[in-house]
UniProtKB/Swiss-Prot annotation:
Cofactor: binding details: Binds 2 magnesium or manganese ions per subunit.
Source taxonomy: Bacteria, Bacillati, Bacillota, Bacilli, Lactobacillales
Cofactors named for this entry: Mg(2+); Mn(2+)
Keywords tagged on the record: ATP-binding, Cell shape, Cell wall biogenesis/degradation, Cytoplasm, Ligase, Magnesium, Manganese, Metal-binding, Nucleotide-binding, Peptidoglycan synthesis
Protein name per the record: D-alanine--D-alanine ligase
Binding sites annotated in the UniProt record for Mg(2+) 2: E310, N312
Organism: Lactobacillus acidophilus (strain ATCC 700396 / NCK56 / N2 / NCFM)
GO molecular function (one): metal ion binding
Length: 360
C-alpha cells in the first residue's frame, strides 16, 4: 500500500477574512482525497492562538466552535516544532488576508524546509499589495485602473493634496474607489462620489493598512478566471458576476451563501473577449511569478476593454467561490483540483532542492 501524504491544513488566523478561511478549510477537508492524504488541521484562532488538533477537527465540523485550550505562540520555535503533530509532508495554508497570503507564512515554511501549496514568498507579497500588482501588470501591457496611493505619513498630513477630494478628482474623476492596498475580499473598500464620502472612506481604509489606494471607477461587468500550476499553468475559462443590488462585489457578496450576486460560468461573452481575459491572466500570473494557484479578476467595460482589478493568489474555497467552480467547468473536479494543488507545491519544493545555495 502506498504511504499516504501527511498534509498540514492551516486555517483561521488573525485576519479580517477569518470566517472565509474557516469555511474554505472545512470544504477542502471534506473534498480532499482521503485515499492519498491524511489531513492534520492546524487552527489559528482569530486572536492568534494555536488550537489542538482535536479542537481543530471540531471547528472544521462546526465553524462556530470556540477554542477551549488555546496555545499562545510567543516565538517562532513554538510554531516550527508543531508539537503533538506527526511529521508533516506538505502544508496547505488557507489563511486569507494579512500574515497568511502576504509572504509571512510562506517564509516560515521556507525556514522549516517544508513544501507548501500556493505562492512562494515573493509572489505572495507582490500580489497582496495591489499597487505592486498594478505596476507589474502594466509592465506586460495589461490595462489597470488609474490610481494614486496614499501612505500613512501623507494621511497624517492634513494639508496633503491627496486628501483633497476635488484635487484627486482632477486626475481620477469624481467617481472613485478607496481601498486598503494590502487587503482582500473587498474588506475596507468603499465607493465614493463626494468629499464627505471620500474622507470617511479614507478613515475606514486606514484602519486596515498603512497604504491606501484611490482608483478611478471602471464601469462594466466583473469577469474572472482561474489559474493552476507552476511554470506551465492551466488557465480555466471565464466567469461573469452580476450583482443584483447594482453595487460592487462586496465581502458579503463574495462569501455569503445567500448572496444576491449571480455567477455565470461560463460567461456569455464573445470569444475574443474570453481570449483576452485568459491571456491577460496568464501574463499577470507569470510576471508576478505566481505558482500553484490564483484567481484573476477584471472589469469588462462597455466598449470591450478588459481592465485588471485584482490578483487573488489564495482564492476562497467557500460554497460559492469562483476558483473551484471555474475548474469544475474546465473538467477538473474539486477533489482532483486539491490533489493537483498539493502536487504543484511538492514539485516546486523538489526543484528547489536541486539548486545550489553555496559556492563550491
Amino acid at each position: 500500500m502506498t504511504k499516504k501524504i501527511q498534509v498540514g491544513l492551516i486555517f483561521g488566523g488573525n485576519s479580517s477574512e477569518y470566517e472565509v478561511s474557516i469555511v474554505s478549510g472545512h470544504n477542502i477537508y471534506k473534498a480532499i482525497d482521503k485515499d492519498k492524504f491524511d489531513v492534520h488541521p492546524i487552527w489559528i484562532t482569530n486572536e492568534g492562538y494555536f488550537a489542538s488538533e482535536e479542537e481543530s477537527f471540531k471547528v472544521l465540523e462546526d465553524p462556530s466552535y470556540q477554542v477551549e485550550n488555546p496555545h499562545k505562540v510567543n516565538n517562532i520555535s513554538n510554531i516550527i516544532e508543531l508539537k503533538n503533530l506527526p511529521e508533516i509532508d506538505v502544508f496547505f495554508p488557507i489563511v486569507h488576508g494579512n500574515l497568511g497570503e502576504d509572504g509571512v507564512l510562506q517564509g516560515l515554511f521556507r525556514l522549516m524546509n517544508k513544501p507548501f501549496v500556493g505562492d512562494d514568498v515573493l509572489a505572495a507579497a507582490a500580489t497582496m499589495d495591489k499597487e505592486f500588482t498594478k505596476i507589474l501588470a502594466q509592465r506586460v501591457g495589461v490595462p489597470v485602473a488609474d490610481w494614486i496611493s496614499i501612505k500613512r505619513f501623507e494621511y497624517d498630513d492634513k494639508n496633503n493634496d491627496k486628501l483633497n477630494y476635488e484635487k484627486v478628482a482632477e486626475k481620477l474623476g469624481h467617481d472613485m474607489f478607496v481601498k486598503p492596498s494590502n487587503q482582500g475580499s473587498s474588506v475596507g473598500v468603499n465607493h465614493v462620489t463626494n468629499a464627505e464620502e471620500y474622507a470617511a472612506a479614507l478613515e475606514e481604509a486606514f484602519k486596515y493598512d498603512d497604504k491606501v489606494l484611490v482608483e478611478e471607477t471602471v464601469p462594466g461587468t466583473e469577469v474572472e478566471t482561474a489559474v493552476l500550476g507552476n511554470d506551465k499553468p492551466i488557465v480555466a475559462g471565464v466567469g461573469q458576476i452580476t450583482n443584483a443590488k447594482g453595487s460592487f462585489y462586496t465581502y458579503e457578496n463574495k462569501y455569503d451563501d445567500n448572496s444576491t450576486s449571480k455567477l455565470q460560468i461560463p460567461a456569455d461573452l464573445p470569444q475574443d473577449i474570453v481570449d483576452t481575459v485568459r491571456e491577460n491572466a496568464r501574463k499577470v500570473y507569470e510576471i508576478t511569478e505566481c505558482s500553484g494557484m490564483a484567481r484573476i479578476d477584471s472589469m469588462l467595460t462597455p466598449d470591450g476593454k478588459v481592465v485588471l482589478t485584482e490578483v487573488n493568489a489564495l482564492p476562497g474555497f467557500t460554497n460559492i467561490s469562483m476558483y473551484p467552480k471555474l475548474f469544475e467547468e474546465a473538467g477538473i473536479p474539486y477533489t482532483e483540483l486539491i490533489t493537483r494543488l498539493i502536487q504543484a507545491g511538492m514539485d516546486r519544493f523538489d526543484h528547489k532542492k536541486t539548486l545550489l545555495h553555496k559556492h563550491d
